[in-house]
Amino acid sequence: MTIALGTFTKEENDLFDIMDDWLRRDRFVFVGWSGLLLFPCAYFALGGWFTGTTFVTSWYTHGLASSYLEGCNFLTAAVSTPANSLAHSLLLLWGPEAQGDFTRWCQLGGLWTFVALHGAFGLIGFMLRQFELARSVQLRPYNAIAFSGPIAVFVSVFLIYPLGQSGWFFAPSFGVAAIFRFILFFQGFHNWTLNPFHMMGVAGVLGAALLCAIHGATVENTLFEDGDGANTFRAFNPTQAEETYSMVTANRFWSQIFGVAFSNKRWLHFFMLFVPVTGLWMSAIGVVGLALNLRAYDFVSQEIRAAEDPEFETFYTKNILLNEGIRAWMAAQDQPHENLIFPEEVLPRGNAL
């Protein structure tokens, strides 16, 4: 009988193995297969945004100045959406709109679709990066799952919402003041603050902030092996074998404060994951609803009574009037291509006037 010793090895020159070895080897900045999507898309998205905010005007799409070159600052510069007449065109540089002319492409708003699409794929690449690294070091993939929340919000707001409307024009432009304008637009045209999905989103984000503050303070409060003298940084010593904080003490403290407390670390940290991610997903679902022009809560009985009785008004009816004002004043400013002119007598006024 013949016994063969040693291991069977594949052909060393296999292209996939060579690429896999190079992409996933241990280095200061991990690349990975996900990096083939992440790094180019992130580079182009950020590069497009810096280019647009520095040099490109929004005069031809919105009738606005939007670049540092025109006098804007960091808060007012933006990469603005294409004109409404371009609908949902991808606005490729070589497409029928720009016909390979880079200057014309920028004037038409081509940088917005460029930044939006590369940004979306860059975020997806970052989530895949977390999956890939988690698999490499044998972790659960909850980081990647949690990051699906911001991705869902980005995709719903910047892509799905304008796809449900008449064009990319109604998406947010990429800038601070531009996002504020979009928020006012959402309130005036969709009554977004009274939408239950927005309420769940606010509860999730603010609830997560509260949980983070409570959790961080509690762990700091219950650290032990805390060093000697004024130096407290030994609490973070990575070579300390045992735990650095007391879960039992934390449980007793919050049991006395609230009457209830987490007794299990896994449930506690899952809850801290669940609250913000669920909130972000609910917000994203709500924005998808707005893309289809679904309405928020309507308390019609209060509106009818307020219209009939000058002395009856609620915070809801006042908000409805404010929304009408936003629509009337904003539409003419925000959609100059419609040539909207509202006479004074049709502009909304509250009962107090």
Swiss-Prot record:
- Residue positions binding pheophytin a: 130, 143
Q: Topology versus the membrane, per the UniProt entry?
A: Multi-pass membrane protein
Q: Which GO terms describe its biological process?
A: photosynthetic electron transport in photosystem II
- Pfam families reported for this sequence: Photo_RC (PF00124)
Q: Give me the residues that bind chlorophyll a PD2, please.
A: 198
| Residue numbers binding chlorophyll a ChlzD2 | 118
Which positions does UniProt annotate for a plastoquinone binding? 215, 262
Membrane-spanning parts: 41-61, 125-141, 153-166, 208-228, 279-295
Quaternary data: PSII is composed of 1 copy each of membrane proteins PsbA, PsbB, PsbC, PsbD, PsbE, PsbF, PsbH, PsbI, PsbJ, PsbK, PsbL, PsbM, PsbT, PsbX, PsbY, PsbZ, Psb30/Ycf12, at least 3 peripheral proteins of the oxygen-evolving complex and a large number of cofactors. It forms dimeric complexes.
Kindly provide the name given to this protein in its UniProt entry. Photosystem II D2 protein
- Organism from which the protein derives: Drimys granadensis
Gene that encodes the chain: psbD
